[in-house]
């Protein structure tokens, strides 16, 4: 397949801009001396190019997408339509608040809804993704300790069953990361936690249910231990889909958390975004929240102002506003009855699929799971040299997206499966049969498993090479070649370059 830069011809285009003479503008920034090298293609070529690209990818609209810890549920298209209403799209973030009262009402209403769902009292919608929310929440914890003159609290405790971005976010916020192990049941080791807390503990980061799909039965004791040591408790909302509307992080003893609107609340997040990672917190942390705080006045109008001790903006304006609109539509559609039903169905689907696969694949933990479960291919790797990667690649030839591989790290040769609530029983049965068929193939012809996939547009990629020596932009021969590592990298390797 050609890159879009390799298509078209000089002078070809798809714009219909009428002739005009733009006014001269005096700018105070450097201007380009040469025109951008952009593809010159017709609208037909452009449409076909991106249609071809779409055919080579797999999304939730194409088929089963059980990517563990990612909650790849169906994204209702009516939410997209609502977010594209002119009242939402034809506005500017610098407009006066009196001109955008409807938008402020949406922001205020979803903040209120998220607080009700989580058991928190205040919320900011500024963070644009989950890890961004983690970082923001950790800055709130840091600001609170510093406001009390308690600067010695420099350590964040992170269990080995926590979400993968937690240690990185804590380090980014300039905390020392203290890892503690799980017990034999896959939950937090209470004795290890007691030994880890002290007068230098700033807080604990925890995902519940955790990344092996288990709800920690000692959650109230865990948060009590941290609070007794003077620390705060951070809830990673990555797995909130399993418990939304049923139990609330605030009631478990957590002080601050983030939510993933692009996961739990069904906004699109394939292809890298856009996402949204709001942070909700208890009252005592509200003065530190970033961005504008929206208040409803007695006359029904809304105002926006900065919190008294705000940590500063973590993103410009109201972040990914149209993503928030989509999530708000989802919440309104499900309501107080539908939200817990969705969570219960997600748990039911995961347990149904786990039960069907148990006895064929080895489960990492022999417990009732929540919204996802983890299988281990360690035995297959040892006996037949068939890895989790081999199984995942073979699944691609059957039209389903592979599960998350090699995560969580505490499970060797892991495959983490999250079917979500939007899949039917028929789809789950079909997926189970595919998993069983692939396992049978691996037992009959283990050596062939290293060659999968056969039917995808691209076979096995050099994933190690891509990670260590990524080529993330296209450089054509028409542009000035750049020397990288002693080689001319302009236009190298054709299709290996990033398209468009």
Residue ranges with predicted function:
Residues 58-78, 126-134, 265-280, 284-285, ...:
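Conserved phosphate/anionic-ligand binding catalytic regions in large, soluble enzymes, centered on
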Residues 124, 178-180, 403:
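General small-molecule cofactor/ligand-binding pocket signal
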Residues 1-122, 146, 247, 297-303, ...:
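Non-catalytic terminal extensions of PLP-dependent enzymes
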Residues 121-127, 155-158:
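A short, small-residue-rich loop immediately preceding and capping a beta-strand
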Residues 127, 182, 206-209, 375-377, ...:
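Short glycine-centered, acidic/aromatic-flanked micro-motifs in structured strand/loop junctions
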Residues 66, 127, 182, 208, ...:
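Proline- and acidic/polar-enriched loop/turn elements at helix boundaries
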């Amino acid at each position: 397949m050609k890159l879009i830069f390799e298509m078209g011809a000089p002078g070809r285009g798809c714009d219909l801009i009428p002739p005009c003479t733009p006014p001269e503008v005096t700018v105070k920034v450097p201007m380009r001396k040469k025109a951008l090298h952009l593809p010159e293609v017709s609208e037909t070529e452009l449409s076909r190019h991106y249609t071809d690209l779409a055919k080579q990818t797999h999304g939730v609209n194409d088929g089963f997408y059980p990517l563990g810890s990612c909650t790849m549920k169906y994204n209702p298209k009516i939410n997209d339509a609502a977010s594209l209403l002119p009242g939402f799209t034809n506005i500017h973030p610098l407009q006066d608040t009196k001109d955008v009262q409807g938008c402020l009402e949406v922001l205020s209403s979803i903040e209120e809804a998220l607080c009700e769902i989580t058991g928190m009292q205040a919320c900011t919608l500024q963070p644009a993704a989950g890890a961004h929310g983690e970082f923001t929440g950790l800055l709130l914890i840091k600001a609170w300790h510093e406001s009390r003159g308690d600067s010695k609290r420099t350590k964040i405790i992170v269990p080995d069953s926590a979400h993968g971005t937690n240690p990185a976010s804590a380090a980014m916020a300039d905390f020392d990361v203290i890892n503690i192990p799980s017990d034999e049941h896959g939950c937090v080791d209470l004795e290890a936690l007691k030994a880890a807390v002290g007068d230098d503990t700033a807080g604990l980061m925890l995902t519940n249910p955790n990344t092996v799909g288990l709800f920690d039965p000692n959650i109230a004791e865990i948060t009590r231990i941290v609070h007794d040591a003077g620390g705060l408790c951070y809830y990673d909302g990555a797995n909130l889909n399993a418990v939304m509307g049923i139990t609330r992080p605030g009631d478990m003893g957590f002080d601050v958390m983030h939510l993933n609107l692009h996961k739990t609340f069904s906004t699109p997040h394939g292809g890298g975004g856009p996402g949204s990672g709001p942070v909700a917190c208890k009252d005592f942390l509200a003065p530190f929240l970033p961005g504008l705080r929206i208040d409803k006045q007695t006359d029904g109008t809304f105002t926006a102002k900065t919190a008294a001790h705000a940590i500063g903006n973590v993103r410009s304006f109201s972040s990914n506003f149209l993503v928030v609109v989509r999530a708000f539509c989802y919440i309104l559609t499900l309501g107080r009855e539908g939200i817990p039903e969705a969570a219960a169905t997600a748990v039911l689907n995961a347990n149904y699929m786990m039960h069907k696969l148990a006895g064929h694949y080895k489960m990492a933990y022999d417990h009732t799971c929540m919204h996802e479960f983890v299988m281990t291919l360690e035995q297959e790797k040892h006996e037949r040299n068939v890895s989790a990667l081999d199984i995942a690649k073979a699944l691609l030839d059957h039209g389903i997206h592979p599960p998350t591989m090699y995560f969580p790290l505490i499970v060797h040769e892991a495959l983490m499966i999250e079917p979500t609530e939007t899949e039917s029983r028929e789809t789950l049965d079909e997926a189970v049969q595919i998993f069983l068929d692939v396992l049978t193939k691996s037992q009959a012809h283990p050596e062939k498993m290293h060659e999968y996939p056969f039917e995808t547009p691209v076979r096995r990629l050099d994933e190690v090479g891509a990670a260590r020596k990524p080529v993330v932009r296209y450089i054509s021969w028409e542009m000035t070649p750049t020397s990288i590592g002693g080689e001319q990298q302009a236009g190298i390797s054709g299709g290996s370059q990033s398209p468009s």
